Amino acid sequence: MAKRDYYEVLGLQKGASDDEIKRAFRKMAMKYHPDRNPGDKEAEENFKEVNEAYDVLKDPDKKAKYDQFGHAAFDGSGGFGGGGFGGFDAGGFDFSEMGGFGDIFESFFGGGFGGGSSRRRNAPQRGADLEYRLNITFEEAVFGCEKEISITRTENCETCHGTGAKAGTSPKTCPKCNGSGQIRVQRQTPLGSFVSTTTCDQCGGTGKVIEDPCPDCKGKGTVRKNRKITVKIPAGVDTGNIIPLRGQGEQGANNGPAGDLYIRVNVAPSKIFRREGSDIYYDYKISMAKAALGAEITVPTVDGNVKYKVPAGTQPGTKFRLKGKGVPHVNGGGRGNQYVHMVVEVPKHLNKEQEEALKAFMKASGESVDDIDEKDEGFFSKFKKKK
């Protein structure tokens, strides 16, 4: 199946701005996110398609290539065929005026023909994303909480404000490349003589030189910092949920925007409750007599103890629902339920009075006590031997 146009995937027109692309991605990612569409294979595929489109369109380099060549820019074949160059003589032709077409020749001859790569080296670049694994308790996941975390990340140097130059000075235009970040080199190849561009070896492609570096960042413009960040955990999160903190990742190069910080949540299990989605399960041990006669019991919930009337004749394995006593739905809209699973306990040891009472119960029920005693050494005698 042919791939859909990446702009179409995000609901955009070709030439959309970076901000439009980012807004469209957030909207579509939220629409098709697996957490919102559990078990929906179509939504899962759409979510993957949206991420693939955004991965290309958010990157200036990839976006430029896609705008020019479409999917062929990334399918490995490049979409270009048609024989070799047999006998072609460039005759000193300068490919630097051919824009993106020069990028194709760059892979063959090592330099840049279009100059695009070096110019992009000067441009602000988005910083890398970070991930932090956060452990929280069962109760914190149910009700939400605030957690302070400590991370180490790259930030702009506060002394030089990201310029890399000592306070009171500023970077100078590179005298070798005149600020372009690239120099032209004539190369002799089997195809003839070519004029190509390559990264300036004096400024490293930035177009600037720092004569008096900042003493704090040593001319880099960035420093590593330890930061404490307060993370607000919404009620209802579960293990594997990810909380994005926009702009809290690594600082981008050349004063570019910072990346994002992703908090991956891990919830510790409860000692008494089990969780399935937004519902909570609790095993309540009840005596055989109370299950038969009915009783009012006290049941623990995440909100505190509640009273519940167990009806007479409750059977082992019966589940009772406590409506609204489960986990809040993480996207809002109420809470799940708590289910109380009745575990009827049969006594392992009986005293004489209990034994007689049960025998009396059997007789009242029309059952023969003699039949029980004669089988398997007697029902009650086995309990006595265990004492």
From Swiss-Prot:
SUPFAM superfamilies, per the entry: Chaperone J-domain, DnaJ/Hsp40 cysteine-rich domain, HSP40/DnaJ peptide-binding domain
GO molecular function: ATP binding; heat shock protein binding; unfolded protein binding; zinc ion binding
Zinc fingers (CR-type) by residue: 144-226
Record text on cofactor binding: Binds 2 Zn(2+) ions per monomer.
Binding-site list for Zn(2+) 1: C157, C160, C214, C217
GO biological process, one term: response to heat
Keyword Heme recorded: no
UniProt keyword annotations, A-Z: Chaperone, Cytoplasm, DNA replication, Metal-binding, Repeat, Stress response, Zinc, Zinc-finger
The keyword Repeat is annotated on this UniProt entry: yes
A Gene Ontology term for the protein's cellular component: cytoplasm
Domain of life of the organism encoding this protein: Bacteria
Binding site for Zn(2+) 2: C174, C177, C200, C203
Renumbered ranges of CXXCXGXG motif repeats: 157-164, 174-181, 200-207, 214-221
Pfam families, A to Z: DnaJ, DnaJ_C, DnaJ_CXXCXGXG
J domain location: 5-70
Oligomeric form and interacting partners: Homodimer.
Function, as annotated: Participates actively in the response to hyperosmotic and heat shock by preventing the aggregation of stress-denatured proteins and by disaggregating proteins, also in an autonomous, DnaK-independent fashion. Unfolded proteins bind initially to DnaJ; upon interaction with the DnaJ-bound protein, DnaK hydrolyzes its bound ATP, resulting in the formation of a stable complex. GrpE releases ADP from DnaK; ATP binding to DnaK triggers the release of the substrate protein, thus completing the reaction cycle.
Family in the record: Belongs to the DnaJ family.
Domain comment (free text): The J domain is necessary and sufficient to stimulate DnaK ATPase activity. Zinc center 1 plays an important role in the autonomous, DnaK-independent chaperone activity of DnaJ. Zinc center 2 is essential for interaction with DnaK and for DnaJ activity.
Protein name: Chaperone protein DnaJ
Organism: Clostridium perfringens (strain 13 / Type A)
